[in-house]
Regions:
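N-terminal post-signal-peptidase region of extra-cytosolic proteins
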Residues: 67-70, 107-116, 122-124
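Extracytoplasmic
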Residues: 122-126, 134-136, 184
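Generic detector of bulky aromatic hydrophobic side chains
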Residues: 127-130, 135, 151-154
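N-terminal secretory signal peptides that target proteins for export/translocation
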Residues: 1-2
């Protein structure tokens, strides 16, 4: 749990960098911080957290449905909690379950266990499940201490894979050839039923931190 606390702080920092500090301080966006794990949820129930996520997504959705919804090899709104438990058990991956079994956080996940192009083990993968049926609605990864070269190569590969599935992003800033992580890199997609964010930046004491997030944005999935 202590490790997940620093993940919360890192995830919040990356969210602010990629989504914009101004947006995160709008009243309607405050629940977004909860969804991203950037602020504590206290004693909020799983249903209350899900409602906060639903409100936040209203400001993030695009207008058109996504041509695909890549999610690191999982299927949004189809993959179940039991499916992910089985995936983790088959690979001897340690996971913690919380929030009334709507949050599963797995640690030290090999990149080849996921459809991810990150070039080193992933520190933590968080799976969020819909309250009513425990189906997957959000998968987020966080990897710290990535070398500039590996981060740039990983980022380019992830961006290329998303572009192949989804086309041009809504917004992006790819790492330049000589990149040290001080200027954040990001790729952002916004659809009526799907949101994807990939980001990388240098953070004090953690080196370059990479984050991938793939989320259902449909009314049924949010």
């Amino acid at each position: 749990m202590r490790r997940w606390k620093w993940t919360i702080r890192l995830g919040g920092a990356l969210a602010a960098a990629t989504l914009g500090v101004g947006l995160l301080h709008l009243p309607a966006a405050r629940p977004l911080l909860t969804r991203l794990g950037a602020c504590p949820v206290g004693r909020a129930s799983a249903s209350e957290i899900e409602e906060a996520r639903r409100i936040a997504l209203r400001s993030l959705r695009g207008d058109a449905p996504a041509p695909a919804r890549p999610a690191l090899g999982f299927e949004l709104e189809r993959t179940t909690l039991d499916d992910v438990r089985g995936w983790a058990r088959a690979r001897a991956i340690a996971c913690d379950e919380s929030r009334e079994s709507t949050l599963l956080v797995c640690r030290r996940v090999q990149a080849d266990a996921l459809e991810s192009d990150v070039l080193q083990p992933i520190d933590e993968v968080a799976f969020v499940f819909r309250v009513r049926d425990r189906r997957l609605v959000n998968v987020t990864t966080l990897t710290a201490g990535v070398s500039p070269r590996h981060a740039a190569d990983s980022f380019a590969a992830i961006a290329a894979a998303l572009s192949s599935s989804l086309g041009a992003p809504e917004a992006s800033r790819l790492p330049p050839q000589r990149w040290d992580g001080t200027r954040p890199a990001f790729v952002r997609y916004r659809y009526l039923d799907y949101v994807a964010d990939v980001s990388a930046m240098q953070l004090p004491g953690r080196g370059i931190v990479m984050r991938e997030q793939y989320m259902s944005a449909s009314e049924s999935g949010s």
